[in-house]
């Protein structure tokens, strides 16, 4: 493996080398140290594979994965890679099956990922076949540990990663339970191609500072302003975070107008304001909660729009974002209608999220030739802890704290 040339400067996580988004050797190391290392990768929703034989194909970083429920009702996950010549075992995005068979040479696997059959293993009419010493039990795709929390299915290649509850920590667990406290149903999906390194999008998710500055819809229609009540929670590892706020019409002030900030534009009006008319369903009054789990999971509640996002690296300068929109299984018809309408707030062409799909590409293009220079991430100081305000980059610094630990790039004492 080629050596990375990433150079970190300073004694804090307030300076991030632009080369971290463009160095291919570093990206190769991410696959081994992060995605196949001591992390829990989000794989799918438990409700997406409800019955025995139901499966989905997905990825842990670049590694293709099969997630399947067996007759014992347990969920199993293994590499989507035939032990013979490396072809994909399952080609469909989802389905139901009693077993899996590779199309290339018809090697077969059960729903726990065990190799159960080799075509013509004994040869034909006494000729050919596998040697007598060949043992199917010693061959097969790598298997992942599986953990389920609040209906979210996670997988890990590591035997050393702590339990999912310990990995998340109590505050993040509580905030996931707040949203996923009862059964959910999938009500929509999008897959979005992003023209940037995966870390630029995950920084964006954790960046409470940008939300009301980049997104005109947020600010103009008062869904999210830094003057509103809210805060940021960062777990001890730094890798997981929650940003939350509450709509407060009385919190509107002239601070955006005084600074001539583009995102506050009173000239814009909605022809159909019913988009913003929802219903109260959370007793704490929080109208926006964005939660992330390292290395690539997001759970959102924006008004009544609930969704999970899965971020996957695809190359040094591109990534994939899978959106899964959710409703509760006991939603009324009117509640489901509201969720579907408010789904237009986010996604590839969402009134809010459209800009997030573009701005990472602006950075990726802007840092060309600047690998030895640094991004400045100093809003709110140099710490990586929780904050009572959202005019801060503390959770972005937290991401880099966790990233550097997994990558063996910690600050030297």
Curated annotation (Swiss-Prot):
This is Terephthalate 1,2-dioxygenase, terminal oxygenase component subunit alpha 2. It holds the Pfam family Rieske. Keywords: 2Fe-2S, Dioxygenase, Iron, Iron-sulfur, Metal-binding, NAD, Oxidoreductase. Its cofactor is Fe cation; [2Fe-2S] cluster. InterPro entries: AhdA1c-like_alpha_C, Rieske_2Fe-2S, Rieske_2Fe-2S_sf, Ring-hydroxy_dOase_2Fe2S_BS, Ring_hydroxy_dOase_asu_C_dom, Rng_hydr_dOase-A. GO terms for biological process: phthalate metabolic process. Component of the terephthalate 1,2-dioxygenase multicomponent enzyme system which catalyzes the dioxygenation of terephthalate (TER/TPA) to 1,2-dihydroxy-3,5-cyclohexadiene-1,4-dicarboxylic acid (DCD). It can also use 2,5-dicarboxypyridine (PDC) and 1,4-napthalenedicarboxylic acid (NDC) as substrates, and preferentially uses NADPH which is the physiological electron donor.
